[in-house]
Amino acid sequence: MRTRAGMSEENPCPRNIFLLCKQYGLELEDLRLLCVYCRRALSDADVLAFAIKELSVVWRKGFPFGACGKCLIAAGKLRQYRHWHYSCYGDTVETETGIPIPQLFMRCYICHKPLSWEEKEALLVGNKRFHNISGRWTGHCMQCGSTCTAPDPASRTLH
């Protein structure tokens, strides 16, 4: 196993943010990461969101990187435009995968948060489509879904 200076032999580049903190003896609130996309420092809120979303730490030249919220959304949109294959309803996803929707691991295609059972259920009950992007099934979380379906303020009429 290859090792890098100052890193343990057991896991030189932990991809989980909590394992990274443990390996270096840091608390999550003391961790400082740069965004892999824009190279700016992640705010405390960005680090916490990165952890909650269970995203993987990216290593470049021996240094760990995360992703800020703005870049995650931009990267999600780019992935959606470049790698969208098709969209379909839940029963089709279950038929194609052979796995019930509640058991499938899915992320929000906008913010990348893992979808909860309730969010998947809301998509099924609301007869919303799931999207195959980069070969993975995705949907939208409740937070991003509400922003996607909110009426356009410009289209409101005055009474």
From Swiss-Prot:
Domain of life: Viruses
Primary localization class, coarse: host cell
Pfam hit, one: E6
Metal-binding found in the keyword field: yes
Coiled coil: none
InterPro entries reported for this sequence: E6 (IPR001334), E6_sf (IPR038575)
UniProt keyword terms in alphabetical order: Activator, DNA-binding, Early protein, Host cytoplasm, Host nucleus, Host-virus interaction, Inhibition of host innate immune response by virus, Metal-binding, Modulation of host cell apoptosis by virus, Transcription, Transcription regulation, Viral immunoevasion, Zinc, Zinc-finger
Subcellular location: Host cytoplasm; Host nucleus
Gene Ontology MF: a single term: zinc ion binding
Entry GO terms, CC: host cell cytoplasm; host cell nucleus
Gene Ontology biological process terms in this record: DNA-templated transcription; regulation of DNA-templated transcription; symbiont-mediated perturbation of host apoptosis; symbiont-mediated perturbation of host ubiquitin-like protein modification; symbiont-mediated suppression of host innate immune response; symbiont-mediated suppression of host type I interferon-mediated signaling pathway
ZnF endpoints (unnamed): 35-71, 108-144
The keyword DNA-binding is assigned to this record: yes
Oligomeric and partner information: Forms homodimers. Interacts with ubiquitin-protein ligase UBE3A/E6-AP; this interaction stimulates UBE3A ubiquitin activity. Interacts with host TP53 and EP300; this interaction inhibits TP53 activity.
Miscellaneous information on this protein: Belongs to the low risk human alphapapillomavirus family. The cancer-causing human papillomavirus E6 protein has a unique carboxy terminal PDZ domain containing substrate but low risk E6s do not possess this domain.
Family assignment from sequence similarity: Belongs to the papillomaviridae E6 protein family.
Function: Plays a major role in the induction and maintenance of cellular transformation. E6 associates with host UBE3A/E6-AP ubiquitin-protein ligase and modulates its activity. Sequesters tumor suppressor TP53 in the host cytoplasm and modulates its activity by interacting with host EP300 that results in the reduction of TP53 acetylation and activation. In turn, apoptosis induced by DNA damage is inhibited. E6 also protects host keratinocytes from apoptosis by mediating the degradation of host BAK1. May also inhibit host immune response.
Entry protein name: Protein E6
Organism: Human papillomavirus 27
Lineage: Viruses, Monodnaviria, Shotokuvirae, Cossaviricota, Papovaviricetes
